[in-house]
Amino acid sequence: MEAENIRADAFEPAKRATKRGASGGGQQDVEMQVDEATGIEGQVLGSSRASAPPKAKRARSELRKVSVPPHRYSSLKEHWMKIFTPVVEHMKLQIRFNMKARQVELRVGPETPDIANLQRGADFVRAFLCGFEVDDALALLRLEDLFVESFEIKDVKTLRGDHQSRAIGRLAGKGGRTKFTIENVTKTRIVLADSKIHILGSYQNIQLARRAVCNLILGSPPSKVYGNLRAVASRLSERM
């Protein structure tokens, strides 16, 4: 067999395939916004999406069920229209309260623009049932990357009887002043439900608020916690 002549100058360097996804084009600037109605900070809705969301598929399996605790029945009935209106008109979801199962059920409708609205609607209802005001929980529908983190006092330190009551008192402060200060500095919302604590906000802000709450539970004086919070908040504002 005759050897075939190979021209070395005819070869071109191989092209490296570009990676798809968020890591391919470097870091993207995330636009943060403080909701004027609630003061909660989060990512601007739609700022992380490169294109318009696809039309949601109509499927009966796309359903979310949120159990209603017994002590929130009356509050749910009282504020039902405030919950129903944004979920149906803005999220374009179908919602109902199943009286027999004691659950709020949400389902994708024919006009739902984004399948992610179903999870956000369920998070909104779940936040209200945790004890947040409707206006505060609405931030979950207005802004992206907001979460509700829940934990108990015993997760931080085992306290019983009067010791636990004093810890709850330190968290609230006189007239709720300590809780309001932590909320304003960290741009979050906090609910003290007996021994359970719920924090609504962005991931970074939740960590700040949780650190302050844990320090108070462990016995740190409020003045020291305020100082640490303001120092961290000022450093974060300089970075932004």
UniProtKB/Swiss-Prot annotation:
Alphabetical UniProt keywords: Nucleus, RNA-binding
Classification of source organism: Eukaryota, Metazoa, Ecdysozoa, Arthropoda, Hexapoda
GO molecular function, one term: RNA binding
Positions of the KH domain: 164-213
Protein name, UniProt field: RNA-binding protein pno1
Composition bias, Basic and acidic residues: 1-15
Coiled-coil segments on the chain, per record: none
Protein family membership: Belongs to the PNO1 family.
Location of the region described as Disordered in the Swiss-Prot/TrEMBL record: 1-61
Any Gene Ontology CC annotation: nucleus
Major location (coarse): nucleus
Cell compartment(s), UniProt: Nucleus, Nucleolus
